[in-house]
C-alpha cells in the first residue's frame, strides 16, 4: 500500500477491526471507523490514540440497511470517496443444532450475513461509479467446512463466502473486487466469550489460536494486491484440511472427535488460567 487511502471498517470497537484501524492510521491512511457500540468505539480510539484528523467514529448497526445507506454516504462526504471497505463486524454464538435459541439464530444471520450483504451492496455501488475499489469480507474457516457445535454460525460463514465470491464475479469487470478472508480461530474478545461454552470446543482445537497480526498480514500482503484474489485462507494447512472435509463430509466424524478432544483440553486450560488470574 504505497499511497494513502480512505477505508471504511465495521466492528472497530474490538478485535480484528480495532487492530486494523490502529495499523491503518499508523500508516497514514484515513479510516471511517464504525461499531454498533459508539461508547466502546470512542474508548478504543482514546486507548489507541487514533489521530482525530484522519479518523471518524460513527455508530452503525450493520443489520440496518437504511443505516448503512446513511452512514456510508456520510463517509463519502467526509473523505470524498472510499477505496476499501472491510466488513468485519461479526457474531459467534456456539450451540448444538437443536438447542440454539431462535433469537440467536436470527442475530447471527442478521449480523453475519445481512450485515455483510448490506455493506457490500452499498460500497459496491459507490465503487462502480469510480470504476475501482475493493471490498474485504471476513468469513471464517467455518465457511469452508462443517463445524459441529456451530451449525448456525457455520451456515452464516458459508453464506458470506458464497456471496463474496459471487459478487466478485459480477463486479470484477467493473473494476471492483470482493475478497473473502477465511481464517481459523482468532484470539479476540468474541472468541473469549465462548470459553465456557462446550459447543465451541472445535474452535479451540489446534496447537494455538491465530493472532490479529496474522489477519493483518493476510489482508495487507495476500488480499490487497493489484488484482485481489477471490478468497484468502489462513493458515493454509489447516484450511486445506477443512476444504478436504468439506469435499468429503463422511470423513468428518473420523477427524472431529480428535479435534473436539483437543479443543476441550485447551478450553479447560484457559478456564484454569482464568481462575488463577482472579
Give the location of each predicted region:
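The beta1-alpha1 cofactor-binding region of Rossmann-like NAD(H)/NADP(H)-dependent oxidoreductases
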Residues: 59-70, 102
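Substrate-binding pocket helix/loop in short-chain dehydrogenase/reductase
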Residues: 96-97, 101-109
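Active-site helix of classical SDR
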Residues: 120, 156
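Residue(s) in the substrate-gating loop at a strand-loop-helix junction
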Residues: 140
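SDR active-site lid
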Residues: 172-236
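Canonical Rossmann dinucleotide-binding motif of NAD(H)/NADP(H)-dependent dehydrogenases/reductases
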Residues: 2-32
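Conserved glycine-rich Rossmann-like NAD(P)H-binding loop of the short-chain dehydrogenase/reductase
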Residues: 27-43
Amino acid at each position: 500500500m504505497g499511497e494513502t487511502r480512505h477505508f471504511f471498517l465495521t466492528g472497530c470497537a474490538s478485535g480484528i477491526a480495532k487492530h486494523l484501524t490502529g495499523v491503518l492510521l499508523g500508516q497514514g491512511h484515513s479510516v471511517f471507523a464504525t461499531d454498533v457500540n459508539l461508547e466502546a468505539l470512542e474508548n478504543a480510539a482514546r486507548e489507541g490514540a487514533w489521530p482525530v484528523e484522519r479518523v471518524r467514529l460513527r455508530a452503525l448497526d450493520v443489520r440496518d440497511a437504511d443505516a448503512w445507506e446513511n452512514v456510508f454516504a456520510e463517509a463519502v462526504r467526509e473523505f470524498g470517496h472510499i477505496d476499501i471497505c472491510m466488513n468485519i463486524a461479526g457474531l459467534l454464538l456456539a450451540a448444538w443444532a437443536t438447542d440454539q435459541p431462535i433469537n440467536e439464530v436470527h442475530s447471527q444471520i442478521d449480523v453475519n450475513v445481512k450485515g455483510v450483504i448490506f455493506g457490500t451492496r452499498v460500497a459496491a455501488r459507490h465503487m462502480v461509479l469510480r470504476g475501482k475499489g475493493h471490498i474485504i469480507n471476513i468469513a471464517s474457516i467455518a465457511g469452508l467446512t462443517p463445524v459441529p457445535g456451530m451449525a448456525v454460525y457455520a451456515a452464516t460463514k458459508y453464506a458470506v463466502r458464497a456471496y463474496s465470491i459471487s459478487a466478485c464475479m459480477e463486479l470484477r469487470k467493473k473494476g471492483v473486487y470482493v475478497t473473502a478472508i477465511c481464517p481459523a480461530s482468532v484470539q479476540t474478545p468474541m472468541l473469549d466469550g465462548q470459553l465456557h461454552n462446550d459447543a465451541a470446543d472445535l474452535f479451540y482445537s489446534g496447537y494455538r489460536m491465530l493472532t490479529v497480526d496474522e489477519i493483518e498480514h493476510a489482508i495487507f500482503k495476500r488480499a490487497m494486491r493489484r488484482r485481489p484474489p477471490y478468497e484468502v485462507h489462513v493458515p493454509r494447512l489447516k484450511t486445506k484440511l477443512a476444504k478436504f472435509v468439506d469435499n468429503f463430509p463422511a470423513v468428518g466424524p473420523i477427524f472431529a472427535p480428535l479435534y473436539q478432544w483437543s479443543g476441550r483440553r485447551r478450553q479447560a486450560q484457559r478456564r484454569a488460567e482464568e481462575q488463577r488470574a482472579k
